Design a protein with these regions (language model features):
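Short recognition helix of helix-turn-helix/winged-helix DNA-binding domains
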Residues: 1-63
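Winged helix-turn-helix DNA-binding recognition segment
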Residues: 43-104
Length: 108
């Protein structure tokens, strides 16, 4: 049964969703993908997934994103493309057979 949130209620783990994202003209799936990727940044920091320029990157395969969001892979690819076009992520190849490094960007 669901409970009301009270002052002493501890919230379970959640992925952050910054307020600026709602004004970017993105699909709801693209917002979900961005939120998922932004949530993964904390884990990347803990695991020292930092490039030579000091930028944190995320490794998250399209297959796993699709599973997490209960979607097929083509809509995830479209959402990633939309996020790239808006300048909110950047994908860099990490070599043949390896997953891309995804740099998640935020607005200052």
């Amino acid at each position: 049964m669901n409970q009301y949130i009270k002052k002493e209620t501890r919230l379970a783990d959640f992925d952050p969703c910054p307020r600026f994202i709602w004004n970017e003209g993105l699909s709801s799936l693209a917002i979900s993908v961005y939120t998922l990727l932004l949530g993964r940044v904390s884990l990347s920091k803990q695991n020292d997934m930092i490039d030579e320029q000091g930028r944190v990157y995320v490794i998250y395969t399209v297959k796993h994103m699709a599973e997490k969001l209960s979607r097929s892979e083509p809509p995830i690819y479209a959402a990633l493309k939309m996020l790239e076009e808006k300048g909110l992520i950047e994908r860099k190849s990490s070599g043949k057979g390896n997953p891309n490094h995804i740099y998640v960007k935020i607005k200052p």
